Amino acid sequence: MPVKIAQVEKCFKSAGPQPNGLQASADGLWCIDQRNNRLYRQDFATGEVLFDAQTDTVHSSGVTVGGGYVWVASTYERKIAQLEIDSGKTVAKYSSPGSGVVGWREGAADAQETGAHGLEWRDGRLYVASPPSQMVHVIDPEGWRETHCFRVPGLRVHGIAWAGDGNLWAADTSAGTVSLLDPHSGRIFDVIRVQAPDEVHGMTIHEGVLWYCSAANCDIGRLLLY
């Protein structure tokens, strides 16, 4: 099979110093920053900040919108925060599924437990990508119950995004790959490479094109295939 290498199109810089989660919506591009923990919404064309709010999350690594709320992965708190969509204020916090020590820190004396990264929403369920468990966990927010989980490829799963065919894109930041997965079995249908030094941290999809952000250099851009 041919190797698919994404052409990285850098669109604009993030509003915050370390963007780590991304979610496309009808009214703009949501971004959560892992350093200042601020929640932004930016214009797709210009990067203009349309919304800006301080959250009480900790070293956040994922964001999505669903059920009338914004959801943020508060990674170092090992929580998923449910926020008011018009203010960024916390409504509730829930235990982050799959929390633990990431594989590359296993056995280290100073290893710290952390939580989720990428988030997505579909059909009333929250999809939670967890680097410690190397899985995507499917959560029913009513009662905060895990209904399913499936393994994802790679060492460090990060952003996730729904493809138009109902499958799920998942980024592995350590390997520089984005894989297309069956959201029930985890079976891999396709793989895209993203060449260094570019890194995919947060990821989403808008008008059929994958968008990414990188905490390493504040880039927000698109992953194009020709």
Where are these regions (language model features)?
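Blade/loop signatures of beta-propeller domains
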Residues: 1-5
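A short beta-strand motif characteristic of beta-propeller blades
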Residues: 7-13, 48-53, 89-94, 98-109, ...
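Beta-rich, blade/repeat-based domains predominating
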Residues: 14-26, 56-66, 97-123, 153-165, ...
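Conserved beta-strand positions in repeat-built beta-propeller and related beta-rich domains
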Residues: 15, 31-36, 72-77, 128-133, ...
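Short loop/turn segments that connect beta-strands within beta-propeller blades
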Residues: 43-47, 84-88, 140-144, 182-186, ...
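Blade-level signature of beta-propeller repeat domains, shared across WD40, Kelch, NHL, RCC1
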Residues: 198-226
